[in-house]
Amino acid sequence: MGSPHLQPCPGARTGFVFICPGRFEASRGYPCAAGTGANLARVLLALHERLPAFFPSPARDKYVITNSWDKVEYPALTQRSVPTLDEVLGAANLERLAAEIGRLDAVVACGAHAHAAVRALADRGSIQARLAFGRHLSQRAVNMIPGASDTPGRIGVWCDGVVAQLLQQG
């Protein structure tokens, strides 16, 4: 069973790491709810078409989806929307994340905090997966992707980057 920070998927080969659960994740009980979840659905459709060896399904329940920080953060609850980098890189937190993604063949890190956590795990040898790094999939972050003028185009650019990174490590 999942939680606001983690959607486990026994047998999955690929996973996504985001920053932390927020109020929508807390109320719905699973990671990447609301706008981020809608963009993740768009990404999964595109990645499944482009690289089915790593993305065998467009369905989100076929992937591990987790966060670099497992605690819910949003201003009305915690007076902030993200953890500190020191919290994300803390030993206990990295051990938790390694347990969640350590057996995957491919990991896509979404957002700066996720990048830092996944790089730290790779540097320590805690994960041996192929790694890709992209912007967070919040609508605000997607709107900042250069090279396209609308959400579908920006999602395409994002997916191109992920595919290129994963294939480069072959």
Locate the predicted segments by residue.
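Basic, amphipathic N-terminal segments that precede the first structured/catalytic domain
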Residues: M1, V163-G170
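Generic hydrophobic alpha-helical segments
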Residues: G90-L97, I155-W158, V162-L166
